[in-house]
């Protein structure tokens, strides 16, 4: 569908109007309208600075600021709904301001280009979204921490290669995801420091001849510093790439946990039970309860990866300074933000009220395997037997047990002592699952005291940053 072309600020340079199909092709208003609140805020700061610097009169500055506030109100109430002929959010706002104020509205763009304008808008937007996502990460961590604190002494099989390896405290397993989320929170905090740099005043690429005060607009908008180079200011998309990379890692961590929930909820595992609040059924199989939430989180992860790769490809061959290619930086960014926010919310709800762990099933799983085999080798090594010799002996024992349909706990003391004279009656205590977990009390290990201390540290961090 095409739309009739309307005059643009640059129309006097051209003899004929833009082709209607190219109007649609060029337009970004369909998605960059998401920046309108930030565009209005940035424009108000710019107008205030222009008036303070006597580039426009005080009365004109006040009229522009008030006009922009009226546009904000009109947008929020649905009265201002620009079409594709506006091309982008910046022209849409300027056109409406001119309708309201006449020639005074045309003065807003003095000493400014859309190039530094869009950079400012995007940073203001992303700064807010980063703050929101960091708060979401804290909410997610609180829910995981609550689950971990409830299951400090609940055991779960630990896996390598998706094969039973060693038993763990369930709290220790969840703590691993708490630490991943902490790195995500810190990573976004680091990004925010670099994000908080103002490009406003850089102009199209070379600065401006007007006596503007870039530090003033930066202060009005809450930026901590300004770009030192005007070319860099309008060309830089590092912060968007950094955000998409950080968002990708958040999604990696959510997706890994989602995958585990999917496995745990299966009949083959039955480690968790999904509540009706966070599961759906089948249109044909009445017995089904499907883990849609973690499956969607797992599926949505790829789209965030794609947005990161797409932006890197857009940027890799661009000469300085602004190029129309950079219009392609926004749709992926907006979608990645929405995806991360929705997935964090969904996973928080899932762990708050959407699943329950099944301690009896978990305990039975831990009891019915050879994940205590390493502890038999450690038992002998602690009594002077070289570890590799002990390791090989236990490997033979496991093979024999498998052939006979036994577990290690089923061997009699006589059978143990026939294997090696160092075995005594306390071998049964050493290989009991609770003791196996408790004994791994090295710093950062799954031992109950270590996990209790680790969770206390997490709670302290969360309370300090609430």
Swiss-Prot record:
It comes from Synechococcus elongatus (strain ATCC 33912 / PCC 7942 / FACHB-805). One of its GO terms (biological process) is arginine biosynthetic process via ornithine. Pathway: Amino-acid biosynthesis; L-arginine biosynthesis; L-arginine from L-ornithine and carbamoyl phosphate: step 3/3. It is an enzyme of class 4 (lyase). This is Argininosuccinate lyase. One of its GO terms (cellular component) is cytosol. HAMAP family: Arg_succ_lyase. NCBIfam families: argH.
């Amino acid at each position: 569908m095409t739309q009739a072309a309307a005059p643009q600020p640059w129309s006097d340079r051209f003899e004929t109007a833009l082709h209607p199909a190219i109007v649609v092709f060029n337009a970004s208003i369909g998605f960059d309208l998401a920046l309108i609140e930030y565009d209005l805020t940035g424009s108000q700061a710019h107008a205030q600075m222009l008036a303070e610097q006597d580039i426009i009169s005080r009365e004109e500055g006040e009229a522009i600021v008030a006009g922009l506030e009226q546009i904000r109100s009109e947008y929020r109430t649905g009265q201002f709904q620009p079409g594709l002929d506006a091309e982008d959010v910046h022209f849409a706002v300027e056109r409406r301001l001119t309708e309201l104020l006449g020639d005074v509205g045309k003065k807003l763009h003095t000493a400014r280009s859309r190039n530094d304008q869009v950079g400012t808008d995007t940073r203001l937007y992303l700064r807010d979204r980063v703050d929101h996502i960091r708060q979401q990460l804290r909410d997610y961590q609180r829910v995981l921490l609550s689950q971990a604190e409830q299951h400090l002494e609940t055991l779960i099989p630990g896996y390598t290669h998706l094969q039973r390896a060693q038993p763990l405290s369930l709290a220790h397993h969840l703590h691993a995801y708490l630490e991943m989320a902490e790195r995500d929170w810190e990573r976004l905090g680091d990004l925010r420091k670099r994000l908080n740099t103002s490009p406003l005043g850089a102009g199209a690429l070379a600065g401006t001849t007007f006596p503007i005060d870039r530090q003033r607009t930066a202060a009005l908008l809450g930026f901590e510093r300004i770009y030192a180079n005007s070319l860099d200011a309008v060309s830089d998309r590092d912060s968007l790439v950094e955000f998409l990379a950080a968002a990708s890692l958040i999604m990696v961590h959510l997706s890994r946990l989602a995958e585990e929930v999917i496995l745990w909820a299966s009949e083959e595992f039955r480690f968790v039970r999904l509540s009706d609040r966070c599961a759906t059924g089948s249109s044909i199989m009445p017995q089904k309860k499907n883990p849609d939430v973690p499956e969607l989180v797992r599926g949505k992860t790829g789209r965030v990866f794609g947005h990161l790769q797409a932006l890197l490809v857009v940027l890799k061959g661009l000469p300085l300074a602004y190029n129309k290619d950079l219009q392609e930086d926004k749709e992926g960014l907006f979608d990645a933000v929405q995806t991360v926010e929705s997935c964090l919310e969904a996973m928080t709800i899932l762990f708050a009220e959407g699943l329950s762990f099944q301690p009896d099933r978990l305990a039975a799983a831990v009891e019915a395997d050879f994940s205590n085999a390493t502890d038999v080798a450690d038992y002998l090594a602690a009594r002077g037997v070289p570890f590799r010799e002990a390791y090989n002996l236990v490997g033979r024992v496991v093979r024999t047990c498998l052939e006979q349909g036994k577990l290690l706990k089923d061997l009699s003391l006589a059978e143990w002592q026939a294997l090696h004279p160092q075995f005594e009656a306390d071998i049964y205590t050493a290989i009991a699952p609770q003791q196996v977990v408790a004994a791994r009390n090295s710093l950062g290990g799954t031992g109950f005291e270590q996990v209790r201390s680790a969770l206390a540290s997490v709670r302290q961090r969360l309370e300090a940053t609430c």
